[in-house]
């Protein structure tokens, strides 16, 4: 839809600091998951290595494996706020490294990578002549914090593929609409695979996405709800001795450290039975994820239902047999 691409070009300039040609630099995709797959496909072959700051979105590891590549986790440290350093990247670099795959803001940790982390990443990518793929699905709710777009850093647009989604920020998950932004040269490398790999994006989904871009005021209620819920989660869950949760930096997720209580897989199963709540086991998010649980705070429209669930989790964890 040309109108959607034009609206996206305006948004990219205002929000992301990117000046793009809507017809040459934007590709509409049926959701960001297919967009990520498509972004990786032309650049990763059998045995090629992809550096993935971890914990990270599970599909990042899976997509690389499907293409015959080798996902290499760059394990980040909670004590550093899960920020990224040049030294961490260099420690994992080999002659087979082809790409860095970053989720920014991070899923599951909610980390917004700061300017120093992103500049270190940009310097690393340029020095080693790599491709950077960035998933920015959670960019819309950062609670006033600066959220830089790596492709906007000097020298990075030519070697960065940025994947965006309408599912997380605008609540259009059922419509399956996302988009890829990259240089002309990278787009030419990717486009030959587009129709056969990801198919078409529905017309109705594109119309809904355009309407959301033109009337963003509805997002104010989402922002209000997520602000309330992240603070309630922080307040309620940190009441449990041995449980540690940083105040979420972005989106509608929470990353809970339960390692002092015991095995995160067992605790996740326990909470289903004793709190009637299903949390994601951190082991699914790569190295550094074990001992953690991911909670989604955006399920209900009613804040009180979320608060009630948080209180059930708290009470169940207070009663959990300590290891």
Predicted regions and their residues:
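A short helix->loop->beta-strand "cap" motif at the edges of active sites that frequently abuts
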Residues: 48, 69, 127-131, 156-158
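A short helix-loop-beta submotif of the ANL/AMP-binding
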Residues: 66-72
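Conserved core segment of the aminotransferase class I/II
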Residues: 155-227, 231-236, 317-320
């Amino acid at each position: 839809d040309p109108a959607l691409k034009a609206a996206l070009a305006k948004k990219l300039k205002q929000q992301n600091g990117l000046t793009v040609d809507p017809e040459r630099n934007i590709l509409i995709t049926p959701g960001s998951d297919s967009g990520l797959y498509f972004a990786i496909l032309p650049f990763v072959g059998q045995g090629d290595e992809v550096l993935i700051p971890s914990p990270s979105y599970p599909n990042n590891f899976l997509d690389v494996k499907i293409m015959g590549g080798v996902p290499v986790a760059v394990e980040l440290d909670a004590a550093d706020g899960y920020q990224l350093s040049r030294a961490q990247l260099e420690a994992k670099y080999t002659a087979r490294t082809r790409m860095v795959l970053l989720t920014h803001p991070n899923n599951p940790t909610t980390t917004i990578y700061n300017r120093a982390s992103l500049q270190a990443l940009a310097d690393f990518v340029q020095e080693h002549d790599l491709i950077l793929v960035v998933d920015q699905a959670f960019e819309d709710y950062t609670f006033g914090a600066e959220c830089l777009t790596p492709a906007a850093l000097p020298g990075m647009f030519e070697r960065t593929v940025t994947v965006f989604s309408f599912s997380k920020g605008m609540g259009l998950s059922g419509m399956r609409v996302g988009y890829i932004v990259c240089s002309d040269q990278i787009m030419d490398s990717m486009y030959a695979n587009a129709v056969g790999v990801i198919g078409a994006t529905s017309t109705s989904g594109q119309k809904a996405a355009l309407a959301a871009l033109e009337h963003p005021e509805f997002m104010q209620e989402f922002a209000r709800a997520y602000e309330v819920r992240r603070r309630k989660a922080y307040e309620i869950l940190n009441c449990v001795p041995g449980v540690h949760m940083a105040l979420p930096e972005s989106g509608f997720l929470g990353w809970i450290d339960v390692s002092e209580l015991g095995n995160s897989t067992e605790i996740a199963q326990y909470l289903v039975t004793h709190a009637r709540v299903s949390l994601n086991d951190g082991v699914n998010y790569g190295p550094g994820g074990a001992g953690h649980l991911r909670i989604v705070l955006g399920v209900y429209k009613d804040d009180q239902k979320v608060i009630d669930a948080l209180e059930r989790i708290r009470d169940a964890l207070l009663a959990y047999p300590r290891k």
